[in-house]
From Swiss-Prot:
It comes from Jannaschia sp. (strain CCS1). This is tRNA pseudouridine synthase A. Homodimer. Substrate binds at Y111. The gene is truA. The keyword Transcription regulation does not apply.
């Protein structure tokens, strides 16, 4: 059966996460329902990462084995038609190698977290960013984030029910970006690693908010990391501001396929 790779964008707000769940809306369920409109034997779709309830994606990658050969453009068009009105879109599609696996072939994953600092409530970004009242020290947050670069035990920054066999992860990049808005300031946290623990990004961002507000010193991020104790984590940031932005592979699975431009 021919295997196809998909790049998927979605608004996580109406879904109970990526993973299919009985009687609950999920992104996987929405995509598989669209696939069911195209082939009698509904393909199972596997993703690079299982995002949680309310988490969004700009560059989720998934694959599925189809019953027949499809032109990638026509397959993407058909899926996007049947996905409506769900806030899910296929933005790239390609015929993949038979041994390609969206999750296990991935060499890195990237996430961006959006935080908007202002007194007024969010309107257009409501449900798509963390609203923080007051100002934050971006320089201090960037200094605190540097303590997390490299290979560490991230027990402090993972959920207590995380199922990963090991808390050891290598953080390749944490970058803090400040963007001026007409009303307020947006702070974006860009993180990149081969893989992440459950709630790792949200735990890190919530702790960095403590640094930005002055409740923690930048060095407190190192202290919390070295404690290897979940109780030493700061606030866990809400899911609203988290976006899965990309997945990397040794070979671009979409190099010879269709990509929206």
């Amino acid at each position: 059966m021919p295997r196809y790779a998909f790049r998927i964008e979605y608004d996580g707000h109406p879904f109970k996460g990526w993973q299919r769940q009985t009687d609950l809306p999920s992104v996987q369920g929405a995509v598989e329902a669209a696939l069911a409109k195209l082939e009698a034997d509904v393909p199972t779709i596997a993703a690079a990462g299982r995002t949680d309830t309310g988490v969004h994606a700009l560059g989720q990658v998934a694959h599925a084995d189809m019953q027949r050969d499809w032109d990638p453009f026509r397959l993407a068009e058909a899926l996007n038609y049947h996905l409506k009105p769900a806030p899910v879109a296929i933005t790239a599609c390609a015929r993949a190698h038979d041994d390609f696996h969206a999750r296990f072939s991935a060499t890195w994953r990237s996430y961006t977290y959006r935080m908007i600092c202002r007194r007024a409530p969010l309107v257009h970004a409501r449900g798509h960013a963390w609203a923080v009242r007051g100002t934050l020290d971006v320089t201090a947050m960037a200094e605190g984030a540097r303590h997390l670069i490299g290979k560490h035990d991230f027990t402090t920054f993972r959920a207590t029910h995380c199922q990963a066999l090991s808390p050891i992860k290598t953080m390749d990049e944490i970058r803090v970006e400040e963007v001026s808005l007409p009303a307020g300031t947006e702070i974006r946290f860009h993180l990149k690693a081969q893989s992440f623990l459950h709630n790792q990004v949200r735990s890190i961002v919530g702790s960095l908010e403590h640094v930005g507000s002055g409740a923690w010193a930048p060095d407190d991020m190192r202290r919390a990391l070295e404690a290897c104790d979940r109780a030493e984590c700061g606030t866990v940031a809400p899911p609203d501001g988290l976006y899965m932005t990309g997945v990397g592979y040794d070979e671009d699975p979409f190099a010879d396929g269709w990509k929206d431009t």
